[in-house]
Regions:
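Catalytic cores of histone-lysine modification enzymes
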Residues: 1-86
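C-terminal SET catalytic tail plus cysteine-rich post-SET Zn-binding segment of SAM-dependent SET-domain
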Residues: 79-132
């Protein structure tokens, strides 16, 4: 029997992460990144102060504040060689598999160099990069 959702929140090397509860096929939508939309200018001010690490800019005008705990997509961690990507479709931010993901594997996206530089004090420590 397939689980209701193709993912589960669990312990990862960096705290909590989102893991495949069952195999996920390449190009499948996994989870939507949800939360209130705030003006991007307001989000940029929060970002500069590092007041909220769950901001996801969707365009020049709007940013999703993914900090509410109901947004399970906030647990998707960074990897330099990710197995998912963020895709904007009809104003919704979806995480989609870029390769087949085995059951039990952590679901990851590439946060981008700017985010990694701002929030990862010791640099990237993903599985591809390892501890430095």
């Amino acid at each position: 029997m397939m689980p209701d959702k193709p993912f589960r929140v669990g312990r990862s090397a960096t705290g909590l992460g989102l893991f495949a509860a069952a195999p996920i096929e390449k190009d499948a939508d996994i989870v939507e990144y949800t939360g209130p939309r705030i003006p991007t200018r307001e989000a940029q001010a929060l970002d500069r102060r590092r007041a909220n690490k769950y901001l996801f800019e969707i365009d020049r005008r709007w940013t999703i504040d993914g900090s509410p705990r109901s947004n399970v997509a906030r647990y998707v961690n960074h990897a330099c060689d990710p197995n998912a990507e963020a895709v904007l479709s009809r104003g919704r931010m979806m995480f989609r598999a870029v390769k087949d993901i085995a059951a039990g594997a952590e679901i990851t996206i590439d946060y981008g160099d700017e985010h990694v530089a701002l929030y990862f004090k010791s640099g990237c420590r993903c599985e591809s990069c390892g501890p430095r």
